[in-house]
Amino acid sequence: MNPTRRRFLAGVSAMALAPVLAACGGDDSGSASDASSGSQAPTEESAFPVTITHKYGETTIEAAPKRVVCVGLTEQDMLLALGIVPVGVTYWFGDEALQGVYPWAEELLGDAERPTLLKNANGIELEAVAALAPDLVIGLYSSMTEAEYKKLSAMGVPVVAQSSDYADFGVPWDEAALTIGAAVGQPARAEEIVEEVRARIAEEAEAHPEFQGETAAVVAPYEGLFIYGPEDPRSRLLTELGFDLHELITSAEDSDFGISLSSERTSDLGDIGTVVWIDLAADKQVEQLFERTPAYEEGRWVDITDADGSYYVAHSFVTPLSIPYLLDRYVPQLAAAVDGDPATKPPKAAA
């Protein structure tokens, strides 16, 4: 049985980042008094009112928002790309001291205050959101429940939830970006940004024809094995680069987000063309079992660990800002894994 998506995401990030959190000490960044005063970028003509359809109905936004709160895990990147600094963002993983603004987005923050950091281990922090006095709440890369949506809406603020067209945490990066652009009155600029990133991905795919048709899977050693499904952004990016997801995931029932397997089935990964691990060493039993597979012996694997710093975070974020940052490091690793030479070992990614 699959773990719940929210529990899985929280579990993996907690497992991987315990040393980081311990080093950071207590979190003093979460009070509303530390929040920025909000920002408003120029909007496009006739951008408002705009109505956005989502999992729980329709939301109409009447005017350009000035105080945006992100209750999903990655929306801040596109907001920053559009010149908007959110007043609150939801912490997922990575260096907590960055308050949700990572190296690929740092320049866009400018002199603005960092957003207030919200937590989501037990669901959306409704009181903390209310304390930030938002005029727009966005949760596209999320598992927002209907009850949470209703409580947020009861604050008298427009709320944009995740799409009903995909699994929770399954919205494609480009669709999320375009939705955010529409919500803040910059649909044309959002389209430009998306097209630039699509072109970069296509450029990498064209430069690496060996990726075409190669089977791949993204795997985490979580309570045995967790293999990310076709609607997960990490898997989507692999397919955009030309890979095909392995039948181990595509043939499984209820696999949109991913599937759980026992650690004993690690041997099943052996015939996958390229295995992309997220912190393989986190489970020694799984690591030892994988070392006995043809995929390991032939170097057909990549391991992205928390020691890789922001690159590790970028691999999971998959946003218009993080994708170019990721591809600079990710593509050489993938190319080494699929070059057909068992002697080639995937290069270590720079943090």
PLM regions and their residue ranges:
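N-terminal export leaders
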Residues: R5-L9
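Basic- and aromatic-lined ligand-binding clefts that recognize polyanionic substrates
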Residues: R67-L82, R189-L248
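A short, structured surface patch at a secondary-structure boundary
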Residues: E75-A128
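Structured C-terminal subdomain patch of bacterial secreted/periplasmic proteins
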Residues: G270-A351
